[in-house]
């Protein structure tokens, strides 16, 4: 039950790129009593960061990003509608008529709806670009919007409450990309606390900011931690609703996804083989993917410190970068278990041979 509640809390938290504080507070409350936790000016959060000169063993960085896709107020119109820009990648077809929350200048959120044209007034194909949409917060003038505390630069997040569907063992909610990764790191760091002395590696957990707008936080966090090895935890888009069982590489309930390549990184082949061997040893279900598009913080991390062996492990997410998605608790638990087993199996000689 604790696991389910943690995932729900993280999914519900408001945290577009640059405004990740609510997410970080949840994680700090979960873990700050057992680890040293620190935050930098980029809003990256570090759990158990160990200075290089104090390390006795190779350091493995577990990394996820804390931000979610959303929007930001660009201007307030005379009639009180809010002009906005996207923060992160959105398809205009998945945005209209959805509920959102807008952060006011006193730290509260007020509800709104992204504008749409009723079917009665549609002309042509009815398609509308993001640049032509507005957020309606139920006011009728510029002054009313200002009185509500709306400002240029106010962040906007999807207004969605996460649910756990126990019969299907699925979560339905927003921002699983990448609150799922945040939850895994939180759980792993808790679970290994009493076993750290028996591991042959040091472990630091990192929640990086601003991934959705250009992998920015990870540039700073990987330079600060300077790890010997990195495991990036992600919630990549599932493809099992539109690909057959032979071509699908991101199916729900098919296990942890191991990524070979995407446009930002080719995974270290020896590291990938090691991961697959460990998964087989412990009978952990996994699937493999070769991605033609997308990218993760691994794209920046693997280039730091004269090259860091890095891999991306994912929990596939249906309908990523939209208001609502599904993730499987089974896949989450496969990923969690694999990360813990990797930490158990890794040692200095293995890492040197990657």
What are these model-predicted stretches?
Residues 1-354:
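N-terminal hydrophobic/helix-forming segments and targeting peptides
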């Amino acid at each position: 039950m604790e696991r389910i509640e943690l995932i729900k809390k993280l999914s519900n938290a408001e945290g577009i790129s640059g405004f990740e504080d609510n997410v970080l507070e949840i994680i700090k409350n979960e873990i700050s009593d057992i680890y040293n936790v620190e935050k930098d000016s980029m809003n990256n959060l570090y759990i158990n960061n160990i200075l290089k000169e104090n390390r006795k063993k190779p350091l493995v960085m577990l990394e996820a990003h804390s931000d979610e896709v959303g929007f930001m107020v660009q201007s307030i119109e005379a009639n009180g509608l809010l002009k906005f820009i996207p923060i992160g990648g959105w398809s205009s077809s998945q945005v209209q008529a959805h509920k959102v929350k807008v952060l006011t200048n006193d730290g509260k959120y007020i509800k709104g709806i992204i504008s749409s044209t009723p079917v009665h007034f549609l002309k042509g194909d009815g398609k509308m670009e993001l640049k032509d949409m507005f957020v309606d917060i139920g006011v009728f003038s510029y002054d009313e919007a200002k009185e509500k505390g709306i400002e240029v630069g106010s962040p906007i997040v999807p207004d969605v409450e996460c649910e756990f569907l126990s019969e299907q063992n699925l979560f339905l909610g927003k921002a699983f990309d990448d609150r799922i990764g945040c939850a895994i790191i939180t759980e792993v760091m808790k679970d290994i606390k009493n076993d750290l002395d028996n591991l042959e590696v040091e472990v630091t957990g990192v929640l990086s900011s601003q991934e959705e707008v250009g992998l920015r936080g990870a540039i700073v966090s990987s330079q600060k931690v300077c790890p010997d090895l990195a495991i990036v935890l992600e919630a990549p888009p599932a493809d099992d609703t539109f690909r057959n069982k032979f071509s699908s590489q991101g199916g729900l309930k098919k296990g942890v996804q191991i990524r070979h390549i995407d446009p930002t990184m080719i995974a270290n082949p020896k590291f990938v083989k090691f991961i697959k061997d460990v998964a087989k040893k412990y009978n952990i279900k996994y699937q493999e993917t070769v991605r033609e598009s997308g990218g993760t913080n691994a794209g920046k991390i693997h280039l730091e410190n004269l090259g860091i062996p890095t891999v991306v492990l994912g929990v596939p997410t249906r309908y990523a970068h939209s208001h609502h998605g599904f993730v499987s608790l089974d896949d989450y638990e496969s990923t969690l278990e694999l990360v813990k087993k990797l930490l158990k199996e890794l040692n200095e000689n293995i890492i040197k041979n990657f």
